[in-house]
A protein has these predicted regions:
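Primarily recognizes the serine-hydrolase "nucleophile elbow" in alpha/beta-hydrolase
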Residues: 1-60, 66
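Active-site-adjacent alpha-helix of alpha/beta-hydrolase-fold enzymes
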Residues: 65-148
Length: 151
């Protein structure tokens, strides 16, 4: 999402571990003069839920300065995936040219802001996984699922 609203990827991201092959990200880097022109004008505002990449060098100051779309960043302060201080909060701070807000779920992990209903099958213990698959969707501190209405 950060790239879609004007944030250009860093040069380091083009060849980083996990980057797409053939330098595909080079078309969306901050150094590419066409990046600013590729922001869809229909997007008037955005919500970035736990955006990933800052902690791995996919974003830098130059790239984040390209964000000009108003954006609400949502993150958990205990996010172990996107990170908080060095991840989402750093992206928020770096988007200096955008009207922006940061909503922090205190002590929440990566999934707190994403109320994705878990498939019913994930509530059963998996012998193969030696855990409950639901834990992939759950947050121990913030339960963002809608309350059950079945009785």
């Amino acid at each position: 999402l950060v790239n879609v609203i004007g944030g250009g990827y860093s040069e380091a991201s083009v060849t980083a571990n996990g980057a797409p092959p053939n330098r595909l990200l080079s078309h969306r880097t901050a150094s590419n003069p066409d990046v600013a022109g590729k922001v869809d004008p229909r997007i008037k505002a955005a919500i970035a839920i736990a955006p990933w990449g800052m902690q791995n060098g996919f974003w830098d100051a130059a790239g984040l300065a390209g964000v000009r779309t108003p954006v609400l960043f949502v993150a958990g302060s205990a996010d172990v995936v996107a990170q908080y201080e060095t991840g989402t909060k750093a992206i928020y701070k770096g988007a200096v040219n955008a009207e922006r807000w940061l909503l922090t779920f205190v002590n929440a992990n990566h999934n707190a802001g994403a109320p994705i209903p878990a498939p019913i099958e994930t509530y059963r213990y998996s012998e193969r996984m030696k855990s409950y698959p639901f834990l992939h969707y759950a947050d121990a501190v913030w339960d963002s699922r809608a309350p059950r209405r079945d009785g």
